[in-house]
Amino acid sequence: MGFADTVTKAYMKDNTVFADAFNYLIYGGKAVVDPKQLQELDTTEIALPFGTQDAESKPPEEAVQKYRDVLKSAIIKQDDAAAYILLGIENQTDIHYAMPVRNIIYDALQYGKQVADIAAKHRARDGDAKGHSRGEYLSGFYKEDKLTPVITLVLHFGANEWDGPLSLHEMMAVQDPTLLHFVQDYQIHLIDPAKLSAEDLGRFSSSLREVIGYIKYSKDKERLSEFLTDNPRMLLEANAARVIKAVTNTPLEIPEGAEVIDVCKAVEEMMNESEERGELRMLVKLVRDGDLKLERAAEKARMTVEQFETVMENTPSQAV
């Protein structure tokens, strides 16, 4: 796993950020998913042939195993009703052109795991499934059993617009609508910075808004400067700053042990430092080309002549 994958995974595990992503996706930013009602789950998805798990609960050798990025259980309370669901996030720093298939596998494995778990409970409790039909006994899944719904969200941590397929049908070699009508489709849920408007960004309530906004404008210096200047919320937790640093290659200084980072100030200092280095290199070039006297260059750089001479000695010719 690369560094960017590691930091995005750590960031999205935060319940506040995780809930914010799904509140945006499902409820348009309304605070319905409560971070306090989220519980971390094992991200290992194992597909089992239904009803064949042995008495010791050991998966058979032909079991398929995959790993999600983040998976949490949630209790959604709305209008005096409560729903128990599973929420999964897949972080993508690069565009994945088979994402619909990948997500189908994750969701199918989770449903397969639920069926296997339910079947195992029935066997442990009922033994021979007395009072149930042969079909219920063979499948291990009873007529009244229900599955917990799974919603998987793809979060693109990249500045380029996602140009990969958003559905299984888009991936098919056949595009005949008559045939596709009988091919099951699967749509992915995607948050893509490049496609979000300023109004969309305003629907996020956590630092995810600043992270996604920074990524969105990271290739446009002028728009990024406007975003940073007009945003009073750029005092971010360290994990959010690490995501910005990793996925946009912004050389932010994040001191070890720091809990919050003033990203606006850090970027401003970085840009000022970059401008100062550029001006200093230009002065060195002018002196070397004979267009400016050493004493005058030192004065412009606010240095002594000796200090400027040291700078010249340590500045390679190819750097100016």
Task: Annotate each language-model stretch with its function.
Residues M1-V320:
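Elongated, amphipathic alpha-helical interaction scaffolds
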